[in-house]
Amino acid sequence: MIHPTAIVHPSARIDSTANIGPYVVIDEHVELGPGCQVGPHAYLTGHTTIGANNVIHAGAVIGNVPQDLKYRGAPSRLRIGQGNVFREQVTVHCANDLEEDTVIGDGSLFMANVHIAHNVHIGNNVILANGVLLAGHVTLQDRVFLSGHCLVHQFVRIGKLAMMQGGSKVSKDVPPFTIVRDTNIICGLNVIGMRRHGYDSAARLELRKVYHELFRSKKKLDAALATARDLYHGEGAQLMIDFVASTKRGVCADVGKGSVDDESQALE
């Protein structure tokens, strides 16, 4: 159903099961999949493809041009998967050129006033709380959780099941399974998240050992990575080791204060 006050370009591809609310504007090159709901005053624009069962709340702007001085008007793209929720005033921008799309996977929640800039890649089942700001070219792997008003610098990668505490900021990569506080500081492992998503006690203990080798052993990173590769071979361990080894920006540091990593939790 399309509300009579909505303005939908005749060339936009809107599935017949989508529900378009009052005063929505949908531009020419938008494709909106089955079961989507678009709330009042939302604006869908750009070369934007939105999959099934997404919910877009009031005032969200999806697919606008990037805030990048290098952008020269190319018909760059935004691709959104299925089952995501975009709350009030969320903004998501298309890529800044034709070489790469802005991409959002499936099943994520973006709370009010989140900003997702050009060329960002977001995996599945991600949660961004109110006011999170992602700069251009950021990558979030699956099941990342960023608390309210976190700031992520351009080109930063945040690994699987990582978390950021409210108001924290990063300009370096965040390894999988870790928790960020303050600015570029990690303070242990997301043990509860690992447990909830199938990492048994043996896997959690191995990850704790990898974490200590990489971030608390006082070794140079290359030496710590070599030791970790020799000793630890589980799926989670390899994910963390490979992520850290591939960094181009450096990774956040553990400075040994305010740790939330607890041995008893890791062994449960």
Question: Where in the sequence are the language-model features?
Answer:
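Structural signal for interior beta-strand "rungs" in well-ordered beta-sheet cores
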Residues: I2-R181, I185
